[in-house]
Amino acid sequence: MSVFAPIARELDIFFGFSWRDWSTTIIPGSIFAVGAMRDLPPATLVKNYLFLVTWLTPYIYFFNLSNQITGVDEDKINKPDRPIPSGKVTLQGAQRRWIAAFSTFLGIALYQPEFLPETLCWIATVAFLCLTSYGDHWFGKNCVAMTTGTWALLSASWKAIAPATPTSDAWVYAVSVWAGLITHIQDLRDMEGDKAVGRKTLPLVFGDMGSRLIITFFALPAACWVLSLAGIFQLAPVTLGALHAILGYRVLRQGGPRYDHKTYMFYTYIFCLILAFCALDGLGLKINAESLRALLATTGVSLKEL
């Protein structure tokens, strides 16, 4: 057996646990971090970004393992291809990997104490989601946990590259609240599994159509308003307004779980695009198709994907 075979297997397992969440973690964190790279020497830029990747990897892996270890019954219904329900990894194997991911994540913060607030915030958020009943309620699951988790992600992503600024902090807070307001979209596609495990998500509490009306006519306008408070919406008002309108239209369509999954993915692309606009402004660049394409190319994302 090749010495690289165990490494390849672990990478494959990591991908199996985490790939669904890259567009809300590793990719947006990397995009936002680009905005902090202005005037940095190339060697410093590369070193700091590699450190960020080192932090982001256990950030997402620790969460995915925690979520999927405690959510096997739900995954058997909603996502049977995941490593545990598919039999690719045993529950005990996932638990061993959880210990490694958690130890690595916390160890990085102890080595670089300036990341301790974001690290502890994320650990507390994951515990809240996976170990308490409040993490199964629509308000706790999205309004609270998505807000705090996004803050940890974006704050650390910027700080890994350069010190935070008042502007970057305003962006982080605004985008975090934006995410907490409209991530209920993810629950429109998973109602069967959520009902089976006793979750109280927005669609299960207010009904399918009721939740869609709340998201479209309350959460989306409120989210746009929050972005405007930090000056983000003003960076590309026509584009962001149109994208949120399209998102609202898709939410109201009731096209079934597969359609709702695509709507959720569309939401994650808007998330990445918002951070790309912030990054371009942080670099002092004019926002246009060419500058956006160049920025996204540094993170492996194309305009077609967005």
From Swiss-Prot:
The chain crosses the membrane at residues 13-33, 43-63, 115-135, 161-181, 213-233, 265-285. GO terms for molecular function: lyase activity; transferase activity, transferring alkyl or aryl (other than methyl) groups. Glycans are attached at residue 64. Keywords: Glycoprotein, Lyase, Membrane, Transferase, Transmembrane, Transmembrane helix. It holds the Pfam family UbiA. The keyword Ribosomal protein does not apply. Its main location: membrane. The keyword Transmembrane applies. Its cofactor is Mg(2+). InterPro entries: Prenyltransferase_related (IPR050475), UbiA_prenyltransferase (IPR000537), UbiA_sf (IPR044878). It is a multi-pass membrane protein. Pathway: Secondary metabolite biosynthesis. It is found in: Membrane. It is an enzyme of class 4 (lyase). It catalyses: (2E,6E,10E)-geranylgeranyl diphosphate = (-)-cyatha-3,12-diene + diphosphate. GO terms for cellular component: membrane. It comes from the Eukaryota. EDTA completely blocks the reaction. Its EC number is 4.2.3.206. Diterpene cyclase; part of the gene cluster that mediates the biosynthesis of erinacines, cyathane-xylosides that show unique biological activities, including leishmanicidal activity, stimulating activity for nerve growth-factor synthesis, and agonistic activity toward the kappa opioid receptor. Within the pathway, eriG acts as a diterpene cyclase that converts geranylgeranyl diphosphate (GGPP) into cyatha-3,12-diene. EriG is unable to use geranyl diphosphate (GPP) or farnesyl diphosphate (FPP) as substrates. Belongs to the UbiA prenyltransferase family. This is Diterpene cyclase eriG. It comes from Hericium erinaceus (Lion's mane mushroom). The gene is eriG.
